[in-house]
Amino acid sequence: MSITTPANPTDAVRLVTTEDAPWADTGTGVLLKVVRFDSSHGTWVILNRFQPGVQLQTHRHTGSVDAFTSAGRWHDLEYDFYVTEGSYLYEPANSVHTLHVPAENTGDTDVCFIIEGALLNLAEDGSVESVSDGPGTLEAYYALLEAQGDPRPNGLIV
């Protein structure tokens, strides 16, 4: 058996040690780490740490989302179930929801999101108020780290 090294280094297996990457503080009770951004497929992988009581703007996904919760609990206001530590949630394209972390949580809630496409952040009337996507999130992550005085992490897969 032989092992071939890919001609394109971006095709190689990559390991990211997320503990080595700094959290970017958004100032809204949400901490962020960008782990991967693939511009050719529109896929982005982020880690979020939500403080108790955080609520995100209602949004629509243009693609599917996979969510893995490693600590805490959260829910979408539109549904009657909670996503808890050890849970996996699939959100199909075009789903609309409002992520909420209960204020009575006793600690932070950590979630890894694998996102295809963009989030369309909606105004109360349902119109698109803003767009969150991989390129914009990566740019914001770098800007927040710079403002905090933290270096860009090594090993980020872009």
Question: Whereabouts are the PLM-identified features?
Answer:
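Short glycine/proline-enriched turns and hinge-like loops at secondary-structure junctions
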Residues: 42-43, 60-62, 81-82, 103-104
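A short, N-terminal "cap"/entry segment at the start of jelly-roll beta-barrel domains
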Residues: 1-42, 135-136, 145-158
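Ligand-binding loop in jelly-roll beta-barrel domains
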Residues: 93-124
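Short acidic-glycine-tyrosine-enriched beta hairpin
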Residues: 39, 77-97
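Glycine- and acidic-residue-biased ligand/ion/polar-headgroup-sensing regions
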Residues: 52, 61-78, 84
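Short, well-ordered beta-strand segments in beta-rich or mixed alpha/beta enzyme
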Residues: 47-50, 69-74, 99, 111-113
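Glycine- and charge-enriched low-complexity intrinsically disordered segments
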Residues: 126-145
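Conserved short histidine dyad/triad with adjacent acidic residue
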Residues: 29, 34-36, 42-60, 92-96
